[in-house]
Amino acid sequence: MGKVLVMLTAAAAVVACSVATVMVRRRMKGRRKWRRVVGLLKDLEEACETPLGRLRQMVDAIAVEMQAGLVSEGGSKLKMLLTFVDDLPNGSETGTYYALHLGGSYFRIIKVHLGGQRSSLEVQDVERHSIPTSLMNSTSEVLFDFLASSLQRFIEKEGNDFSLSQPLKRELAFTFSFPVKQTSISSGVLIKWTKGFAISEMAGEDIAECLQGALNKRGLDIRVAALVNDTVGALSFGHFHDPDTIAAVVFGTGSNACYLERTDAIIKCQNPRTTSGSMVVNMEWGNFWSSRLPRTSYDLELDAESMNSNDMGFEKMIGGMYLGDIVRRVILRMSQESDIFGPISSILSTPFVLRTNSVSAMHEDDTSELQEVARILKDLGVSEVPMKVRKLVVKICDVVTRRAARLAAAGIAGILKKVGRDGSGGGRRSDKQIMRRTVVAVEGGLYLNYRMFREYMDEALRDILGEDVAQHVVVKAMEDGSSIGSALLLASSQSVQTIPSV
């Protein structure tokens, strides 16, 4: 009996040792996998670093590219497109106008009434709709008929409300958030699609004529009287409320900027049609490129798999369309290197399935258990992850968003440097200037709705400029500014006004 007990005890000890060995091996294996994930995070942080010195080098590079783009066509990655806008709203405009805004993920229709004073601006009707994905790869006829039918329904809702004192033909501003080479304030040809649109036969077509043709087919007595880039609309809205506004930036699905430039600095345009001495320039800065940009392997993968590879590199690092997919790619890589996220789901492997608004929700999750992070991961096919993994995801969101926001700030500072509002004198006649109050209008869901992006960008801009200069620079957020501003610009173009030199 004693011998049996000894044998059982020995066997139990062997089993216990075996179990302990397995558990130790599993823990060691788990630690190795976690170390790999931590290593990937560290690599990401290092690749996304944007120290102040690098940002200031980018500011210089942007200012140089701006100058090159003003000298000759094709002389820069920045197109620096003329808009033929040399007068901006000042509050004296009157009348009722419409605007239709085609953005990267939505379109808006608005009706604006102006009574001759800033305080009398009345936005009477607003409709906002998501753009059906099918339209983004359809034909020009389908796209513009859709827009025309939407505008027709909008006007039919008015009934007899349209003022009899207005001309019979309604005036429409078409806000168009894609690169266009303007030939006048009311016409321009499409250069290329961005933000996921791919309607091939549209390149080189006059955008205003396309919309006008669709309106005419439906018997609508509406004249497309202005073709306006969304940034120019935002600048118009900003200037209407604050004459110190000299630039506008959109951070939404994509990103772009415009600003007021002296006409004598626009060397590629020998005879600009302006008497004001200034013209709004549409930068199309999404295509900016510099060796100083902190590009990662995830950016390279995203670019290679996009419909416009080797194009719009800057926009793909700061645009709302792309931030979510960069975060997704990081999580996917970690899933491939480790099992901390469980089995790799087909959902997580799908490009653009993670939207930037979800990144914002995870990044700003203030619940004790990071429940929003857990919910969104579950939607991606990742369930029951421990707290440390949820915190890891928040950190990934932080790294990607912080980089984007700081690069965005460098873009704004580059504009300020070019126009001599960064304290250095820029390309202006005198390096010694008294700092003037400078307003930059900012629009777009990424800036308006993503608090951490906004805070990181504002902080970086202050760091780049320094406190002495930053106190003179005001970044003003505005909602629907590009749509309303386009209607204001249309009203302004109906009267004889000029904008001050910058």
Curated annotation (Swiss-Prot):
It is a single-pass membrane protein. D-glucose binds at T194, K195, N229, D230, N256, E284, E315. Its main location: mitochondrion. Pathway: Carbohydrate metabolism; hexose metabolism; Carbohydrate degradation; glycolysis; D-glyceraldehyde 3-phosphate and glycerone phosphate from D-glucose: step 1/4. It catalyses: a D-hexose + ATP = a D-hexose 6-phosphate + ADP + H(+); D-fructose + ATP = D-fructose 6-phosphate + ADP + H(+); D-glucose + ATP = D-glucose 6-phosphate + ADP + H(+). Residues 35-491 form the Hexokinase domain. Pfam families: Hexokinase_1, Hexokinase_2. This is Hexokinase-4.
